[in-house]
UniProtKB/Swiss-Prot annotation:
Family per record: Belongs to the class-II aminoacyl-tRNA synthetase family. Type-1 seryl-tRNA synthetase subfamily.
Name of this chain's protein: Serine--tRNA ligase
Annotated keywords: Aminoacyl-tRNA synthetase, ATP-binding, Cytoplasm, Ligase, Nucleotide-binding, Protein biosynthesis
GO biological process: selenocysteine biosynthetic process; seryl-tRNA aminoacylation
Subunit structure: Homodimer. The tRNA molecule binds across the dimer.
Record has ATP-binding as a keyword: yes
Binding site for ATP: R268, S269, E270, E355, I356, S357, S358
Amino acid sequence: MLDPNLLRNEPDAVAEKLARRGFKLDVDKLRALEERRKVLQVNTENLQAERNSRSKSIGQAKARGEDIEPLRLEVNKLGEELDAAKAELESLQAEIRDIALTIPNLPADDVPVGKDENDNVEVSRWGTPREFDFDVRDHVTLGEMHAGLDFAAAVKLTGSRFVVMKGQIARMHRALSQFMLDLHTEQHGYSENYVPYLVNHDTLYGTGQLPKFAGDLFHTRPLEEEADSSNYALIPTAEVPLTNLVRDEIIDEDALPIKMTAHTPCFRSEAGSYGRDTRGLIRMHQFDKVEMVQIVRPEESMDALEEMTGHAEKVLQLLGLPYRKIVLCTGDMGFGACKTYDLEVWIPAQNTYREISSCSNVWDFQARRMQARCRSKSDKKTRLVHTLNGSGLAVGRTLVAVMENYQQADGRIEVPEVLRPYMNGLEYIG
């Protein structure tokens, strides 16, 4: 959520920056609402002052032995007018807030301006894609060869865009998540967390999924009206519960940065992706991810973004997977991000790079929604923290990359050296 003072005082500057994202801010409407708010605010304050004054007059008139009934009726009428004015003001403030909740974050000044993914800018590459001297199999074919990926069983159990993993493929999937967690906790300074996979609406508002992206979530509801009326949603990413751990908190600045990680399943409806990536593990309704979240001082957030992206890169480097680093243009960034790096891993069967990690600096956009603040020891003043989140990595897509990049001519899959300790020394699947 943007700073309301910025929206009130510099709407044209805000509109210009949002236009870089392809978002049109209705400045005239905001100005009209703000002018109306000022009028209602003054009217409410005047009515309150008048009512207070008349209420005091009742006591004074009573002390003089005068008839107070006319004054009492006047105070009652003022009270009714005040209640109506407050209700109108609150309704208008709610309308302004609802609009503010739909406005994306401002892009950082160094983010390239563009319309969509075609305007993203490549920053660097690591590793060289392997040259195969045999026909490359995709991960679905490899998974079926080793009886490790069963999409038909998942359709029977649930539906499309789900999978049942079995045997050594399932074991490698688990090994990848353990390897990532160990790397981030033992070498990168993150604390491991286990979080709920169901969250309430306040939590989803805090990180920006609601109200704008309700259609992207899987929501729960009671089977009967008389049942528990709690309304939860499955998490689309561990960013949601991890970041909300600091909601409504005031943190000593000396305790920053806070670096958290968690391995969770993620659930997404994939609304709008009909017909895309229908084969395999690339785009699923349920997938595992190891998430990184940092809570930092405002002046340190851009450095933290570089650090966090490096942590995700380290996973790929230790696995020996070629990748490229992309800075997203203004039109391709997520709703809450001010700057985002994507890491794209080489997928041999597709002969292209595919996203495997996205690391974003959100500035104070989420912190303002969550009222997450830090306090300075020197002057005891509080200010909003900055939050960052990143994939470290998407486990299913990493499995795809390992299976395809490490495949052998006979269909076996070599186990990367860093994963062998998690697989009892196994060198090959198959």
